[in-house]
């Protein structure tokens, strides 16, 4: 659900029920979710299935805020702000997961990062429903974190 690994508890009359731990509530945007707000739903990847994008675990690191959205030609440039402690793991051209969508960081900025979104992705996800100031779930690429951690321990 919007990039967060959750287990469906019940599904009845198009109403889904999930249990959210305190950690999930703390790290994700779910505590700010509004009634009827559109979220992305992803089925879990089964062993042996093709990966289309990068490895998104559903382990959200932080909440990001959309600072700006610009439509340039047919694509969209999103500018995100994230907390300072998470910025150290942001690497240009690395993968990042926004609301469960595998994307590529096009530029690291002073307060966060930018991504480009193609029309197909924009149309099929909730990125088309959010605006400047909206909050998003951010999962930083696990490989970036592993490499950074490895080199920090070598020091």
List the predicted regions and their residue ranges.
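Conserved loop->alpha-helix
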Residues: 1-155
